[in-house]
Amino acid sequence: MENFRKVRSEEAPAGDGDEGGSPNSGPFADLAPGAVHMRVKEGSKIRNLLAFATASMAQPATRAIVFSGCGRATTKTVTCAEILKRRLAGLHQVTRLRYRSVREVWQSLPPGPTPGQTPSDPAASLSVLKNVPSLAILLSKDALDPRQLGYQPPNLSPGPSSPPTVSTSKRSLGESAAEEGTAKRSQPEPEAENEDRTA
């Protein structure tokens, strides 16, 4: 493939209607009409996605949001959903994983100038059909059916960014041990007092 370059990549038409273009044909067919769909791409900026998602979920009319991405964008999709769950507590989650067919069109690179070749020779093209993983994450303010596959209830325990409820952090233990050490050092030792008196 070193003599080819990718011209375009497009989603292949689906035969079963599972991945068509309508908004309700995705993995969450029973979504409310006001749900926001965030399509995460490989080149998407996380801060831009989260700014829009946070502003959308702040509106009372928006009850659900779906993050979806395929191929190399799946990790970014998970990152966006996890950050939004940390920012907005109490979100119910359903995760769906599937495969999508993507058609890549490659075109041959023009070879170096050779004698006898005319510049008007058409370049050869190659079409490749690939199955890539696709991930869709639904986050909802409303309770979802806990029996469906991929369901995660809201996280009720404090997250890593929340302060601990009991002050047993390493820092507080270290400080108290250091304070005890300085308190012991500030008291004069009995042997030192005896030496001062004899002198």
Curated annotation (Swiss-Prot):
<dbReference type="Pfam" id="PF01918">
    <property type="entry name" value="Alba"/>
</dbReference>
<keyword id="KW-0694">RNA-binding</keyword>
<keyword id="KW-0819">tRNA processing</keyword>
<feature type="compositionally biased region" description="Acidic residues">
    <location>
        <begin position="190"/>
        <end position="199"/>
    </location>
</feature>
<dbReference type="GO" id="GO:0030681">
    <property type="term" value="C:multimeric ribonuclease P complex"/>
</dbReference>
<comment type="similarity">
    <text>Belongs to the histone-like Alba family.</text>
</comment>
<protein>
    <recommendedName>
        <fullName>Ribonuclease P protein subunit p25</fullName>
    </recommendedName>
</protein>
<keyword id="KW-0597">Phosphoprotein</keyword>
<dbReference type="InterPro" id="IPR051958">
    <property type="entry name" value="Alba-like_NAB"/>
</dbReference>
<dbReference type="InterPro" id="IPR036882">
    <property type="entry name" value="Alba-like_dom_sf"/>
</dbReference>
<feature type="compositionally biased region" description="Basic and acidic residues">
    <location>
        <begin position="1"/>
        <end position="11"/>
    </location>
</feature>
<dbReference type="GO" id="GO:0005730">
    <property type="term" value="C:nucleolus"/>
</dbReference>
<dbReference type="GO" id="GO:0004526">
    <property type="term" value="F:ribonuclease P activity"/>
</dbReference>
<feature type="region of interest" description="Disordered">
    <location>
        <begin position="146"/>
        <end position="199"/>
    </location>
</feature>
<keyword id="KW-0539">Nucleus</keyword>
<dbReference type="GO" id="GO:0034451">
    <property type="term" value="C:centriolar satellite"/>
</dbReference>
<keyword id="KW-0698">rRNA processing</keyword>
<feature type="modified residue" description="Phosphoserine">
    <location>
        <position position="172"/>
    </location>
</feature>
<comment type="function">
    <text>Component of ribonuclease P, a ribonucleoprotein complex that generates mature tRNA molecules by cleaving their 5'-ends. Also a component of the MRP ribonuclease complex, which cleaves pre-rRNA sequences.</text>
</comment>
<dbReference type="GO" id="GO:0001682">
    <property type="term" value="P:tRNA 5'-leader removal"/>
</dbReference>
<dbReference type="GO" id="GO:0005654">
    <property type="term" value="C:nucleoplasm"/>
</dbReference>
<feature type="region of interest" description="Disordered">
    <location>
        <begin position="1"/>
        <end position="31"/>
    </location>
</feature>
<comment type="subunit">
    <text>Component of nuclear RNase P and RNase MRP ribonucleoproteins. RNase P consists of a catalytic RNA moiety and 10 different protein chains; POP1, POP4, POP5, POP7, RPP14, RPP21, RPP25, RPP30, RPP38 and RPP40. Within the RNase P complex, POP1, POP7 and RPP25 form the 'finger' subcomplex, POP5, RPP14, RPP40 and homodimeric RPP30 form the 'palm' subcomplex, and RPP21, POP4 and RPP38 form the 'wrist' subcomplex. All subunits of the RNase P complex interact with the catalytic RNA. Several subunits of RNase P are also part of the RNase MRP complex.</text>
</comment>
<dbReference type="InterPro" id="IPR002775">
    <property type="entry name" value="DNA/RNA-bd_Alba-like"/>
</dbReference>
<dbReference type="GO" id="GO:0033204">
    <property type="term" value="F:ribonuclease P RNA binding"/>
</dbReference>
<dbReference type="GO" id="GO:0000172">
    <property type="term" value="C:ribonuclease MRP complex"/>
</dbReference>
<dbReference type="GO" id="GO:0006364">
    <property type="term" value="P:rRNA processing"/>
</dbReference>
